[in-house]
C-alpha cells in the first residue's frame, strides 16, 4: 500500500484530502507545518507528498526544495497545492523540484488522477533504483573478478609493482608479466579504447590469451610477432569496434637485453643513473598502429641494454592526460619529470606518484583508466 503525506496548515483541507485518499485505498498521514512534514518524511519516507504552497513558517516551495535535495528522498513524488496559477509561479515551483501542481479549489477527479499518475512515476523510479543497485552489485563483482586476474607484485629476481585505478568500476586497461623460461620474462600493458564493460571484455580476452599462450606456433619471445598475431585475432570489425594500444617487452636477465615493440602506445620510460641531475632517460617505443585498426598493420622490434639499478615504467595515457584545475591538460614530459624527481628521493615511488596524480586531477574521478607498471632491475 502506498503511503501519502498531506502537509497543510488548514485542518479542513487536511481532513478532506485524508478521507478522499483513504477511500482510494491509500495510507495517509498528515502534518500541519512544513517543519513537521519534513520530520515525518525523514522518519518514514512516503511515496507521494501533497503540500500547500503558502503556510506559516516554511512554505511549500521550501519544503519541496529541502526534500528533493536529499538523495534518499529524491524519488518521492511532490505535488504542490496552490491558488497561484501564473507561469512565473509554476516555474518557481518546478525549479524547487515540484513534480506536479493542483490548483485550488480542489477538483476531486483531477486530484485522484494526478495522484495515480504520480504514484506510477514513483513506482517506476523505485524500479529503476532497484535495477541500478542490482547493476552496481554485478559490476562490483565483475570488478573483483578483473582484479583477481591481475598479477601479484613480485620481489625477486625482479622487483615488479603497479598501480591500477580504473576511471569507472570497470576499466579498459590490463597488464601482466610472466616468465617464458627461467631467464626471460614477458611484460606488457594494454589500453582498450573506451571505458566500462565493453572495454574490459577485450582486455580480459587478451590477458587470458597471452597468459595461456593459446596462440599456437607463436614466438612469444618476439614482441613484433606477438603484436601481429593479436592484430590478426582482434580486428575491430569483429570486436564491437574496439581496438587497443599495447606495449610488449621481453627481458633476458642473463644478457640484460630488453626487446620490445609497441602498437600506438605511449613510450615506456627507462631511467638509469645515480641522481636527478645524472639520469639517463630512454623512451622505449616503436612505430605501429593500435591493434585491431588495420589487418595489414606491421610491427617492428627494438632492443636496449638494461644498466644495473635501472627502473622501467610502463603506463597507459591516463597517467598523464589529466585535466588540471586551470583546465589545461597535463603532459607526458611533466609526468616523466615526476618519475625522475621521485626516483632517488623515496622508496615507494608508485604511492607518491598516485597521490600526486590524484591531487593534480581537477575532477572527482579520473577521465581515463590509470595503470602504471614499475620494474626495478638489479
Show the residue positions of the predicted features:
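Active-site beta3 strand of CheY-like receiver
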Residues: 44-50
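The feature encodes the CheY-like receiver
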Residues: 14, 56-57, 65, 74, ...
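Receiver (REC) domain active-site loop signature in two-component systems and cognate sites
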Residues: 55, 67, 93
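Charged docking surfaces used in two-component/phosphorelay signaling
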Residues: 15-23
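… and, occasionally, acidic/histidine-rich disordered N-termini of signaling adaptors
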Residues: 129-312, 364-378
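Active-site-proximal, acidic helix/loop segment immediately C-terminal to a metal-coordinating Asp/Glu
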Residues: 197-220, 306-364
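Acidic catalytic/metal-coordinating carboxylates
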Residues: 2, 32-36, 47, 59-65
Amino acid at each position: 500500500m502506498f503511503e501519502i503525506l498531506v502537509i497543510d496548515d488548514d485542518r479542513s483541507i487536511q481532513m478532506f484530502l485524508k478521507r478522499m485518499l483513504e477511500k482510494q485505498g491509500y495510507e495517509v498521514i498528515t502534518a500541519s507545518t512544513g517543519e513537521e512534514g519534513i520530520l515525518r518524511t525523514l522518519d518514514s519516507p512516503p511515496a507521494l507528498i501533497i503540500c500547500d504552497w503558502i503556510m506559516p513558517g516554511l512554505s511549500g516551495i521550501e519544503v519541496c526544495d529541502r526534500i528533493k535535495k536529499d538523495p534518499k528522498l529524491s524519488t518521492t513524488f511532490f505535488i504542490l497545492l496552490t491558488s497561484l496559477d501564473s507561469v512565473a509561479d509554476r516555474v518557481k515551483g518546478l525549479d524547487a523540484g515540484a513534480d506536479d501542481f493542483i490548483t485550488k479549489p480542489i477538483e476531486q477527479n483531477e486530484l485522484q488522477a494526478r495522484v495515480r499518475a504520480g504514484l506510477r512515476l514513483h513506482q517506476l523510479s523505485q524500479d529503476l533504483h532497484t535495477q541500478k543497485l542490482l547493476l552496481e552489485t554485478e559490476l562490483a563483482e565483475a570488478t573483483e573478478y578483473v582484479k583477481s586476474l591481475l598479477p601479484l607484485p613480485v620481489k625477486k629476481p625482479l622487483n615488479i609493482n603497479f598501480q591500477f585505478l580504473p576511471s569507472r568500476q570497470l576499466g579498459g586497461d590490463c597488464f601482466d608479466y610472466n616468465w617464458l623460461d627461467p631467464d626471460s620474462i614477458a611484460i606488457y600493458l594494454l589500453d582498450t579504447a573506451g571505458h566500462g564493460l565493453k572495454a574490459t571484455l577485450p582486455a580480459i580476452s587478451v590477458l587470458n590469451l597471452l597468459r595461456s599462450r593459446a596462440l599456437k606456433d607463436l614466438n612469444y619471445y618476439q614482441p613484433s610477432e606477438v603484436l601481429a598475431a593479436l592484430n590478426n585475432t582482434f580486428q575491430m570489425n569483429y570486436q564491437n569496434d574496439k581496438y587497443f594500444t599495447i606495449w610488449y617487452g621481453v627481458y633476458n636477465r642473463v644478457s640484460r637485453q630488453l626487446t620490445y615493440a609497441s602498437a600506438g602506445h605511449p613510450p615506456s620510460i627507462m631511467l638509469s643513473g645515480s641522481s636527478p641531475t645524472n639520469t639517463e632517460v630512454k623512451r622505449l617505443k616503436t612505430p605501429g598502429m593500435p591493434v585491431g585498426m588495420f589487418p595489414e598493420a606491421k610491427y617492428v622490434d627494438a632492443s636496449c641494454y638494461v644498466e644495473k639499478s635501472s627502473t622501467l615504467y610502463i603506463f597507459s595515457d591516463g597517467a598523464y592526460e589529466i585535466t588540471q584545475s586551470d583546465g589545461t591538460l597535463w603532459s607526458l614530459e611533466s609526468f616523466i619529470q615526476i618519475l625522475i624527481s621521485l626516483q632517488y628521493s623515496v622508496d615507494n615511488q608508485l604511492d607518491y606518484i598516485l597521490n600526486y596524480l590524484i591531487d593534480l586531477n581537477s575532477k572527482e574521478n579520473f577521465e581515463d583508466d590509470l595503470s602504471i607498471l614499475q620494474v626495478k632491475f638489479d
